[in-house]
Every structure is written in structure tokens, then in C-alpha cells.
A protein has these predicted regions:
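Domain-scale activation on soluble regions of proteins
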Residues: 1-403
Length: 403
């Protein structure tokens, strides 16, 4: 059974463990962004292929969120890699990141002005398809939040109605866009143009076989974190199994981001769904803490202690807090596992760091198991309180009617 240990440590390395992994950025920003993009699209392809081969509809529905994010992130990374090929001055690079942020259309528009015409190996039809596709993604998901969280910072659900998404079309179009961008980057001149474009340049298409579709159910819209959390945590664990069994170590950072976002979502679920804050208060607290793991924990910690009636001699809260602080210090702003640099262009792994992949995966899952158990406990308590309040209201109404 997974459960936080007294001395759990994300950075612990068992020298006998397999696989062990060393990470160090090369110092070449353009190259690092390109390598990260390859790793992310590879992870997305492995996930989408797995869910298309399975008969488990819940996997299709839940894993959709993480794999779509991985695809989108791969495009953002390769777009920025191309831009940094032509933007070489540090301050200009910082300003570029600030201008485009996560907007794929903005990044592509700037690249279109930067890349000399002689370097563009795309045909006119391919350029038009790519621009339309990236624009469509940006119109749906401008700042890369739509498949990471169930609702915006203003508590508005991203999906207002039941939505069907064809996973095969999604994967095919994402790979088409990635290949076209790779050609612009001059990293893969050998790509054959013939039949490269298979479908219309739409981000989310619902046509095709039902067996190829993921469904975002209407019930997901009501501030429901569950499908997102399950999807991210299960996707992370699947990537871990591929690393362990097939030595696919390039999946490590995508795995870590799947887990990390799953933990952030689990903390926010407790804050929003269990702590009995009104929507505005919950929204303000999330806005203040942003992606801070420790900040979110500090908001809910006392509520958990009061509600759980933990024995005085229990060390669980202290054990969990150790995990929280370690993860927070490892990735304070939720960018270490998805970008090679921070917003000031400092490399995250400018010095060699060694990871025990099995231990890292274990620590993430031990922390998640605790947070998931807390949600179950608080949800049950809130249901009982709601029933008691309803019964008390009925008694008052009955007494009033007698008079």
C-alpha cells in the first residue's frame, strides 16, 4: 500500500536501483527546447496509442487531459526552439517569452517574420494548414490551461457541455503540426510531403468511430477535479512503467509533470470541494497561491487536522509536510519539468542531477494516496453534515407548519 513514509525523500538515490537517470542541460537553449519537444510528443504518442488500443472507456475519457496537454506543450516547445534560432540576444529572448507566453498563434506569427523565405521548406497549402491549426488551438486554449484544470481562475468551466473528441484525429493532427514545424526547424529535411495532411486543421474534432473517442461528460463541468486527477496520475504511472520496463528514460520529465500536476490538482480539489469555502474565497486563495505546492498545502493543512481527529502521537501530517516541502523546493513555479529554463533564461538543470526514477515515482504516489484519502474522508463528512442540515431544516419547516 502507498502511504507517506517518515523519511521519504524525492532526491534519494538507491545505487542498485534501475533505472537511474542523470539530467544536465547542455547550455544551448535552442537545442534544449527541441529535445524537450521530442520527449513530450513521444510521451503523448505512447499514451494515445495505449488508450486507442484499450477497451477501457474511462482511460480514454480521463487520460485525454494529460495527453492533450503533452501534445500542446510539444508544439509550444518546438515553436520556441525555432524562434531562439533567430533570436539570439538574451534580453530579446526574455521579451519574446513574455510576449507570446503560451499562445501558439503568437509564437508562429513571430516565427513567420523571423524565418527567411529561403528557409521555409513548406508548401503554401502546408503553411496555411499549420497556421489555421495553431490559430484554432489558441482560440480554444490560449494559455494552455484547458486540459490542465477543470475551470479558469474565475471558476468558469472550460467545457460547458458534453464534448466528444476523436483521439486518433487529435494525435494525427498534432503529429502533422509537429512534423511541419520540424521541417521549418530544418531538423528533418527527409520528411516526405506526400499525404502529410490527413484531416482538417481543427484542434478538437468529434467525427469518426465511437471507439476512437474520449468523452468529457456533462458531469465533469461542475468543478469536478476527479477525471483530471485520475488521468494525470494514471498517465504518469504508465510512463513510469515504460521507463522501468523499456528503459525509455526520455519520458522522465513528462512523467514528473503528469505527477506534479496531479498533486497540484489533488490539493486544489480539497481546497475547492472539501474545505467549505464559497466559490469566490476559494478562487481568491487559488489565485494567490498559483502553482505553489506548499502554498496550497498551507491553506488546507489546519482544516485537515481539525477535521481528521488525528491522534497526538501520529506523525502522518509531519511526514506529508516533508514530501510537500521537498516537491515545492524541487519545482516551485511548475515549470521545471516542462521547460529547460525559467522566464529569466536560467537553466533548471545547469548542474548534473541524479534521479532514482522508481523512488521519484513512489514519492509522488505516496503523497497522492494521502491527499486522495483526505478527499474521501472530507467528502464523507460533508455529505453527513449536508444530510443533518437538511433534516434540521425539514424539522423547522414542520414545526412552522403546525403553528
Amino acid at each position: 500500500m502507498y502511504w507517506p513514509r517518515k523519511k521519504g525523500n524525492f532526491k534519494f538515490v538507491d545505487k542498485e536501483s534501475i533505472p537511474l537517470l542523470e539530467i544536465k542541460n547542455t547550455g544551448d537553449i535552442e537545442r534544449e527546447f527541441y529535445v524537450y519537444s521530442e520527449n513530450f510528443i513521444s510521451a503523448a504518442n505512447l499514451l494515445v496509442n495505449h488508450v486507442l488500443e484499450t477497451n477501457e472507456n474511462t482511460k480514454k475519457d480521463f487520460w485525454l487531459f494529460g495527453l492533450t496537454y503533452l501534445y500542446r506543450q510539444s508544439l509550444e516547445l518546438i515553436l520556441k526552439s525555432i524562434a531562439f534560432k533567430y533570436i539570439t540576444i538574451k534580453n530579446d529572448r526574455v521579451e519574446f517569452i513574455g510576449r507570446v507566453r503560451h499562445n501558439l498563434k503568437y509564437a508562429y506569427d513571430e516565427i513567420s517574420l523571423l524565418v527567411p523565405a529561403d528557409d521555409l521548406s513548406l508548401k503554401e497549402r502546408e503553411r496555411e494548414w499549420l497556421k489555421t491549426f495553431l490559430t484554432n488551438i489558441s482560440e480554444c486554449d490560449e494559455q494552455s490551461d484547458m486540459f490542465r484544470y477543470p475551470f479558469s481562475i474565475k471558476m468558469k468551466a472550460f467545457f460547458q457541455k458534453q464534448t466528444h473528441i476523436n483521439l486518433r484525429v487529435l494525435g494525427t493532427n498534432m503529429n502533422t503540426a509537429y512534423k511541419l514545424l520540424t521541417m521549418i526547424s530544418n531538423k528533418a529535411d527527409e520528411i516526405d510531403h506526400k499525404d502529410l495532411i490527413k484531416f482538417k486543421p481543427e484542434f478538437l474534432m468529434s467525427s469518426g468511430s465511437y471507439l476512437e473517442q474520449a468523452v468529457i461528460w456533462k458531469g465533469f463541468n461542475n468543478n469536478n477535479y476527479y477525471p483530471y486527477i485520475q488521468g494525470y496520475m494514471e498517465s504518469g504511472k504508465y510512463l513510469y512503467e515504460l521507463i522501468k520496463d523499456d528503459q525509455k528514460v526520455y519520458l522522465f520529465l513528462p512523467m514528473c509533470y503528469m505527477y506534479r500536476n496531479g498533486i497540484e490538482l489533488a490539493l486544489k480539489r480539497i481546497l475547492v470541494e472539501d474545505c467549505q469555502f464559497d466559490n469566490q474565497t476559494a478562487a481568491n486563495k487559488m489565485k494567490n497561491k498559483k502553482h505553489s505546492i506548499e502554498g496550497l498545502w498551507n491553506v488546507i493543512k489546519n482544516y485537515i487536522i481539525i477535521s481528521s481527529d488525528v491522534p497526538d502521537d501520529s506523525s502522518t501530517i509531519n511526514d506529508v509536510e516533508l514530501y510537500i516541502k521537498q516537491l515545492h523546493n524541487l519545482d516551485i513555479t511548475s515549470d521545471k519539468f516542462r521547460y529547460p529554463i525559467n522566464k529569466f533564461l536560467k537553466f533548471h538543470f545547469d548542474k548534473k542531477v541524479r534521479f532514482d526514477v522508481t523512488n521519484v515515482s513512489l514519492c509522488f504516489y505516496e503523497l497522492f494516496t494521502f491527499l486522495d484519502a483526505v478527499d474521501s474522508m472530507l467528502s464523507h463528512q460533508n455529505e453527513i453534515l449536508a444530510e443533518m442540515e437538511l433534516e434540521a431544516r425539514r424539522e423547522l419547516e414542520s414545526d412552522y407548519e403546525r403553528y
